[in-house]
Amino acid sequence: AVLGMATKFSEVTLAQHYRDVALGDDDGPDWLGTVSGGPMYYIEKGLGSGWKWMAVFFAGMLMITSFLTGNANQANTVTDTLSNYSGVFGLDPFTMKVVVGLLVAAIVAVVIIGGVTRIGRFTGVVAPVMAAIYVLGGVVILAMNASELPAAVSTVVTEAFNPQSGVAGTGAGIFLLTMIYGVQRGLFSNEAGQGSAPIAHSAAKTDEPVSEGVVALLEPFIDTIIVCTITGLVIVVTGVWDDTVPTDLDLDGGAVSYRVEGEGGIISSEEPPTEIRIVNGEPRVQEGTPQFAWNEAVVSRFYTGCAAGCDVAEDFQDPFNGTFYPARGVAIANDGTEYENLYGPAVETGAPLTQLAFARGLAPLGNWGGGIVVLSVLLFAISTSISWSYYGDRCAIYLFGESAVLPYKGVFVIMNFLGGIAPLATVWAIGDIALGLVIIPNLIAIVALSGKLREIMDSYFERKAWLSNVDAAKRAREAPSADEE
């Protein structure tokens, strides 16, 4: 995030400098009369027509990314969070995801295709309020667990560079893996270097690119250094990061993997075994044999039932006895009964993990902690998807012209629904690939245009342009209103 602040300043300043303004008319479509900017424009204009191919490549990759990282991932977070409430509505988790996915996709469609600006304004008002509530809730939890903070920070650092379990490798390998995840999730959080945010900042009403760049560099600090750090520490101080909860295990689901304990206690990924024998709920495997894992953590016991609510370990019913066949994704009991789902203690991940942390951390004050996360996820995810639809349609216009906007938005809505029902690991994997493909041309352009960036900055500071902005604001405040005149 610290490095991203400099990157964000650079790309936004360049985008403001090289942006295009399309003049619309009263009879024209809504998307005309707007500003278009972003890396594709400063690549083409700043580096010259010989680099047009890279601008096209960037726009194409960012348009694909808008379907995934900024859309499918967001929908997946919402459905993954709300699927925990499937029992309340008498639905299985997947059906709940389908229902929620359809609702989210419908909301996004109404906003980006129907152009209902009131919903956009509502989100613009509510989202900052929810952000404040989320941060306040996190700060309250940390204050209530202040004595645990030093140990929490120590745990974060220790597990990052010398983990007890969960990933493969040691030494330099584990450092690289830690750095990769940090960069991936940091970029996902603040978009620094990705080239998406400059598209939005290009539309800002200012004649000073540097002033907009300064505003933009605050974003990585706020949403990553502050919000993400609060989230991470809340997860650690409440202890949920290392806890298991009763879980409905889809034996062929996207959260399933197989792990085997290697040297130094590190858990590594392995191909699934042919079968796993389970006696009285406990898997009987030899040392070095891959074991069933959920969210990358080994599941120690399996049950065929779980009482209504399925909230605590005491709710588990009837330990499973039989054989699990990973290739088929089914478990066959000794009496011949086939199960596609079993129950067992498993770790949480993603938004449900954060939800669990807030629920536990704020439990002394009431049972509404998890609700903060649910509402925050719902509002943030939908507003983020709507924002990314704008990024993508600017790319579509750059590549194909205005006629491509409506087809693009149709595909965007479809991808929103598909992302909501796809396995979490799959959505993230594809999103990370697309994310990497847009970063490369953008960073090349930023480095190549660093001289021009310095020229823009020197001009701004030599003119002391910020003083003019202050004077203009002061004159605006002192000017008589129409009523006074």
Regions found by a protein language model. Name each.
Residues L68-T79, V108-G120, V140-A152, L233-V245, ...:
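Transmembrane helix-loop junctions in multi-pass membrane proteins
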Residues Q164, G173, L177-I180, V405-L406, ...:
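A generic transmembrane alpha-helix motif of multi-pass inner-membrane proteins
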Residues L3-T7, G101-V116, A127-S147, V210-G239, ...:
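Selective recognition of specific alpha-helical transmembrane segments in multi-pass small-molecule
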